[in-house]
Amino acid sequence: RDYYASRGLGDVYKRQRLHRGAHYLLNVRPAGEWPAQFFYYAGGVPRIMEEIKSVLHLDVMTVTGKTLGENLEDLKNNGYYEKCGRYLEKWNLKREDIIRPFDQAFGTDGSIAILHGNLAPEGAVVKHTVVPREMFQATLKARPFDCEEDAIHAVLTHEVKPGDAVIIRYEGPKGSGMPEMFYTTEAIASDPELGASIALITDGRFSGASKGPAIGHVSPEAAVGGPIALIEEGDLIQINIPERSLSIVGIAGREIEPAGVDAVLAERRAAWKPKANRYTSGTLKFFTEHAVSAIQGGYME
């Protein structure tokens, strides 16, 4: 907590705390097995609220003129859930296959994790529910790219190999306006071998439908000289989702002590020069000049 508070990142700590212990009940894509419409036929949002009502304020008034608790009770008494379940029967499914009871959750660690370490001193974000278990703890060899176009070309032409960490940088709020790294994540996740053996690490962002071992929002971003800007080919990147860490643990393919890594990064930082803004006019030029880091929300100051 003190780590985040000392950097003015109390909200990051709050998100981390809320996710740890949060029950994960829903088995729909991309993190789960079934299409999103099955969520509706399993009872949808009301069913989720029914499962978690012990932590809800059931006495709050709603637009129906009734309290939340009264609305949920009405749905139950009107046979809403039984009507929904008939569609699932056609697929030989039960409601519990889509929405688990609270005490039988798929997981109890939420769906989002904030990682930090010497690669992301302010933090980075991973949707761990879509990451293959074998990638929860991994040490990978860095393949840095200064834009998504170069990275996806390398993936599609098979220049990226199992055991690599694809680093896409200068795509954060100040770097390029923080576009979505959708094409690269899909190219990796759709390859059975790469999806379970490499990771994508970026100061850019992802969509809610992304899947696979993708870590985004790395802060500070490359455009302001964050550690992600200093990574070179072959550096070793360690991911440890259970420990919530993301660190550079080796240089040029060889693991070394943290103090040695810090010394090398300090040398590289002394030689680093910021890139010119790729936008010369318009809204994106204004945004990139005034945006704060992604971990703080990427808003304009």
Where do the protein language model's features map onto the residues?
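Feature captures the catalytic cores and cofactor-binding loops of soluble hydro-lyases/lyases
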Residues: D11-E301
